[in-house]
Swiss-Prot record:
Family: Belongs to the gemin-2 family.
Region (Disordered): 1-23, 101-130, 151-222
Low complexity: bias regions: 106-126
Coiled-coil annotated spans: 173-224
The keyword Nucleus is assigned to this record: yes
Start-end of Acidic residues biased regions: 11-21, 165-215
Described purpose of this protein according to its UniProt entry: The SMN complex catalyzes the assembly of small nuclear ribonucleoproteins (snRNPs), the building blocks of the spliceosome, and thereby plays an important role in the splicing of cellular pre-mRNAs. Most spliceosomal snRNPs contain a common set of Sm proteins SNRPB, SNRPD1, SNRPD2, SNRPD3, SNRPE, SNRPF and SNRPG that assemble in a heptameric protein ring on the Sm site of the small nuclear RNA to form the core snRNP (Sm core).
One of the GO biological process terms: spliceosomal snRNP assembly
This protein's name: Gem-associated protein 2
Keywords in alphabetical order: Coiled coil, Cytoplasm, mRNA processing, mRNA splicing, Nucleus, Spliceosome
GO CC terms in record: Gemini of Cajal bodies; nucleus; SMN complex; spliceosomal complex
UniProt subcellular location: Nucleus, Gem; Cytoplasm
Length: 331
């Protein structure tokens, strides 16, 4: 370690300590040098696990993730197809970035849509879907794939979190009204004034949304999922794209493979910029393991999901380089 540390000043040869105290500062440093040269580089404490409530640690530091599931060789894409597809995918990404960079800003699109809606109020194609918040995973799922078909669950699934929070606060206020009224009437009047102010703010927000012709997902009616169109993709920045990629991979871990999921994953991966962060790398690795499980269950070469699975697998494994050398043995 001495060669990696810069010296502040020269110290003489080390001196073996004795019972006498050092007479000078230099003599003290020489004794410290003698002790430091005899300290081990690595020290391991001898812990008696019988005296503490901790299990003995295992020899391995972490559990290895599962390997890629094997499938029939005829289900795998050929190297020639992979090479041609990766070239096409790279060109598609460049065209997508070009379209996104040269597309007018969202404010201009909103103004144009508002003018069109004033001329034709019955045209529903000009409605602009309102993007959920980046952290609102639940309503991003509804935005992409729609709400549940059950009418009893629709009301609960379509309501926004802010609306639920306000309703819970109102219920708590109603349960405590009797106690608060008897204790202090002035507190009730203040609460009523605050509620009136909140209602006025909500009414103003609703009027602004009606003027902008924006689709509101807080309605109680069942909603349909949105396809990954250019209007939506051009409104996604890098941070939101990374979050949506991780969301869709997490949903794929818990649900079956569908064409709608493959469309969204393909377009989001087309927008995903390199280099990718470690968390996204880990999620992409989980995604190809999940895709390998889906592919291993396919028995028919004419299965409609097989091309989509191979496309997503090739993008993650080859384009984003998430295929380990040990995984080649399972392909």
């Amino acid at each position: 370690m001495d060669e990696f540390q810069s010296k502040a000043f020269e110290v003489g040869e080390e001196i073996e300590p004795d019972d006498n105290e050092p007479l000078t500062g230099e003599e003290y440093l020489q004794r410290v040098k003698w002790h430091s040269n005899r300290c081990p580089s690595v020290v391991v404490a001898d812990i008696d696990y019988s005296k503490i409530k901790v299990t003995i640690p295992s020899n391995s530091y972490f559990t290895l993730p599962p390997s890629i599931t094997k499938c029939k060789k005829e289900l795998l894409p050929t190297p020639t197809w992979e090479k041609e597809f990766l070239n096409d995918f790279s060109e598609f990404r460049q065209k997508l970035q070009y379209i996104k960079s040269n597309r007018p800003s969202n404010n201009n699109n909103n103004n144009n849509n508002n003018n069109n809606n004033n001329n034709n109020n019955n045209n529903n194609n000009n409605l602009i879907p309102q993007l959920p918040h980046i952290n609102d995973k639940r309503y991003w799922y509804i935005f992409c794939f729609g709400s549940n078909g059950n009418n009893n669950n629709n009301n609960n699934d379509i309501k926004m979190k802010d609306f639920n929070d306000n309703q819970e606060d109102d219920d708590d206020d109603e349960n405590n009204e009797d106690y608060e009224y008897n204790e202090n009437k002035e507190e009730e009047e203040e609460e009523e004034e605050e509620e009136e102010e909140e209602e006025e703010v909500e009414e103003e927000e609703e009027e602004e949304e009606e003027e902008e012709e924006v689709v509101d997902y807080s309605t109680k009616k069942p909603t349909l999922g949105n396809k990954p169109t250019m209007d939506i993709l051009c409104r996604l920045d890098h941070v939101l794209t990374v979050a949506l990629v991780n969301y869709h991979i997490e949903w794929l871990e818990k649900r079956e493979f569908t064409q709608e999921r493959s469309y969204w994953l393909y377009m989001l991966l087309s927008l995903l910029e390199k280099p990718i962060d470690p968390d996204t790398c880990s999620n992409l690795r989980s995604c190809i393991r999940r895709l390998s499980v889906f592919r291993s269950k396919i028995t028919n070469l004419n299965d409609p999901n097989l091309p989509s699975i191979n496309i997503l697998f090739t993008i993650i494994a080859k384009y984003f380089d998430q295929l380990e050398p040990s995984d080649i043995l399972y392909l």
